[in-house]
């Protein structure tokens, strides 16, 4: 049970981290920023997502590559608008699961004719609810595994828990990719 108690603590910490890491629209600077300012803002605000303190969330090269590959819209006279920052936040959240090519297809389809601030506000609203669901679901898995008499030890329960979580993540990833593929097919017509 000790390992599962640690999982509870990790889950509580994750809940707090996810809650603390949401960057509200009001927190995004309402002025145009130079590259270094964008990097400082994003790396500071997304710091909780690092697994290793030495990691960088964003680098100058990464952002330049996003612009070059047209995933991120070009800066205006070397300055990045609040909308650029929102795009970079969405890229950060999505690139954990999707390829940059998939993100580009999605952005090309979705962002051109829509208000980016409204999209991001809606994203934040829905992810708040989703984080609550995820926490509840993981707690449910933990309870099921704790009560499963066929599972003999914590190591096995931990393996099964992680396997369930990755299976669900893979299913969501696959569904997201299929949706993007359908957007690409519609766009190619």
Where in this protein do the model-derived segments appear?
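Basic helix-turn-helix/winged-helix DNA-binding cores
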Residues: 2-111
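Intrinsically disordered, low-complexity, charge-dense segments enriched in Lys/Arg
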Residues: 106-109, 113-189
């Amino acid at each position: 049970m000790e390992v599962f108690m640690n999982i509870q603590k990790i889950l509580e910490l994750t809940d707090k981290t996810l809650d603390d890491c949401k960057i509200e629209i009001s927190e995004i600077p309402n002025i145009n920023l130079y590259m270094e300012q964008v990097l400082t803002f994003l790396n500071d605000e997304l710091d909780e997502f690092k697994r290793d303190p030495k990691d960088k969330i964003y680098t100058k090269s990464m952002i330049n590559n996003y612009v070059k590959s047209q995933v991120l819209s070009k800066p205006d006279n070397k300055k990045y608008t609040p909308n650029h920052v929102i795009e970079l936040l969405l890229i950060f959240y999505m690139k954990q699961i999707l390829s940059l090519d998939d993100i580009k297809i999605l952005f090309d389809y979705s962002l051109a004719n829509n208000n980016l601030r409204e999209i991001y506000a809606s994203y934040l609203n829905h992810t708040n609810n989703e984080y609550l669901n995820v926490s509840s679901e993981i707690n449910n898995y933990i309870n099921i595994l704790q009560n499963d008499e066929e599972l003999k030890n914590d190591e096995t329960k931990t393996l099964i828990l992680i396997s369930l979580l990755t299976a669900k993540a893979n299913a969501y990833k696959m569904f997201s990719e299929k949706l993007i593929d359908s957007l690409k097919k519609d766009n190619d017509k």
